[in-house]
């Protein structure tokens, strides 16, 4: 989640991400990491480096060649500025991957006011979560094919819901009465998601619509699990309970007490095979994974647990993650 609300927790989030990357690299698990954003379209464009992408947001070149050329009525609307930015990959050499992680760390530090400039073409933006879920379906299929995987896990790390989605709709122009393609706000309770011959309905709100999108994407990818890691801001526990955990706890206070005791809560749903909710105040990791390359997976898991020995929330995340990849 490369959104503005992540600014204050991006550094600790990066530490968690790097731990997962190091773990996957040690046991030779292929991975791709993407930042979803609507303010990175200028990456690769022939414009000055010190130009903010929003300075050219209405430029016609935004439409080509990076977005769909044909807009069909009834399809979900994907704005031209949306991007899935590939920030880390297991196909990179070790020194290149280390350099990528260093650049990400410096970017996160710069967002907090460090004494150097951040990359202006990769600033924080909104939260195009629904668009990212749609895109990750194709990206996951591609990874499964190229890496010849039998099982795949998609981990979505965010601190909140995505912004309101829209759909393509033919509309009469106000000026000349000509019918043109526009977009209109989407009502989840009136919307049917179709994937081939399958339909997904029943969403009553935005969060449920997002979950239906996950179900739709999973329906096309066998042996694929979705893991949602939700970083809770102060007071965000009630919202998480209302949207996702009502069927798992009798009262909010029950979930709150478990989170205070363990540092995190874990639930299983039809859409996300595992939901992990963590308070941002407990999201912290300082130690590195100490293990020699080439050792067996059992010892890797032991080293990973040792690294997080005194970190309650980290221990739970590691434990649940190992269960998922077993």
What annotation goes with each model-predicted range?
Residues 2-326:
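Acidic, glycine-rich A-domain
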């Amino acid at each position: 989640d490369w959104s503005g609300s992540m600014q204050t927790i991006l550094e600790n989030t990066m530490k968690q991400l790097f731990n997962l990357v190091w773990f996957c690299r040690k046991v030779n698990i292929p991975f791709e990491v993407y930042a979803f954003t609507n303010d990175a379209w200028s990456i690769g464009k022939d414009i000055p480096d010190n130009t903010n992408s929003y300075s050219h947001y209405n430029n016609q070149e935004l439409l080509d060649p990076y977005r769909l050329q044909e807009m069909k009525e009834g399809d979900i609307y994907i704005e031209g500025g949306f991007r899935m930015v590939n920030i880390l990959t297991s196909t990179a050499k070790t020194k290149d991957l280390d350099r990528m992680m260093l650049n990400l760390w410096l970017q996160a530090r710069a967002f907090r006011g460090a004494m150097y400039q951040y990359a202006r073409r990769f600033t924080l933006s909104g939260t195009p979560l629904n668009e990212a879920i749609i895109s990750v379906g194709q990206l996951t299929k591609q990874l499964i094919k190229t890496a010849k995987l039998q099982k795949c896990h998609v981990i979505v790390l965010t601190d909140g819901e995505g912004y309101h989605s829209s759909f393509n709709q033919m509309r009469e122009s106000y000026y000349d009465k000509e019918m043109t393609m526009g977009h209109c706000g989407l009502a989840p309770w009136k919307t049917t998601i179709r994937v081939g011959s399958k339909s997904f309905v029943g969403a009553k709100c935005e969060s449920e619509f997002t979950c239906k999108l996950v179900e739709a994407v999973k329906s096309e990818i066998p042996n694929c699990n979705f893991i949602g890691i939700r970083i809770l801001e102060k007071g965000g526990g009630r919202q998480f309970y209302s949207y996702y955990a009502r069927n798992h706890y009798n009262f909010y206070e029950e979930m709150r007490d478990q989170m205070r005791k363990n540092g995190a809560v874990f639930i299983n749903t039809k859409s996300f095979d595992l939901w992990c909710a963590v308070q941002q105040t407990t999201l912290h990791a300082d130690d590195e994974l100490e293990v020699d390359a080439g050792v067996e997976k059992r010892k890797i898991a032991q080293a990973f647990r040792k690294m997080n020995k005194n970190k309650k929330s980290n221990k739970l995340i590691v434990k649940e993650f190992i269960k998922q990849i077993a």
